[in-house]
């Protein structure tokens, strides 16, 4: 009788083990289907994941080949990442908190400066989706070889500015409800821009908020000014014949009120002056304040070294100030 009872117990254990093995084999596919279902319904955006790996022993999963596009522009990427590895902290989990570390590997984000238009409420849906599929709290998001692309497809010439080889981290990310106020994250990212210039961006913002409150500092050193000709011609109607220098910009927004400055230190500057009319655009209001002012300085006061400071001020709810969008 006892032997028979042990036999039933053994059979039960074997069946449970087999069920767990089958579940483990099916889990990546189940998670992939769940995530793709969420990513397919993000208002004006849509996304897809190619593959998912589950690492139960370390409480982690890896998402591979994530791509997010706009539904009306499927050929233009908004975001893509080769791998996103998310690992949950067991220590925090035992305390009743879901806290994770995330590694973002070979990721790109594309931002577009276009004509002013009202942003539909649906465009916030991608943020809601992020809140649903990532852990409650991200202790650290590590960026490995990332890229940020800025485009203006309507300017003449078109502008394509790329920050690449980006490495750094973002800390204290939270997808908690914003009823109790903003959830600021700190970031410090370094990389390259304009072929050979070094760039560093640091500050704080609420990435799932409305971008009406933030602080940031951008510093670029070792700029070959001729590499800026797309930007200077599109927004300031002049080209650089030669020159090099450094650039610092600090911006702060509080309840949509934007303040800050841009400060270049440029050496051996020569320019080709173009038409006086400035390119109309959306983010152009800020760019024109910076680039247009530089153009006037170059025209009126040519020197071997130029150091000046341009004030930036405005309201982010004003459609003439900014409309970076996917």
Language-model region placement:
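Flexible beta-edge/linker motif
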Residues: 53-116, 127-149
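N-terminal type II signal-anchor transmembrane helix
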Residues: 1-43
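Extended terminal
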Residues: 1-10, 206, 219, 238-244, ...
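Solvent-exposed coil/turn segments that connect beta secondary-structure elements
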Residues: 66-68, 86-91, 107-109, 146-148, ...
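Elongated, acidic membrane-bridging lipid-handling scaffolds
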Residues: 41, 123-229, 312-314, 319-326
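Flexible, surface-exposed loop regions and adjacent strand-edge segments
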Residues: 116-123, 235, 278-283
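Amphipathic hydrophobic-ligand
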Residues: 44-46, 73-87, 124, 155-171, ...
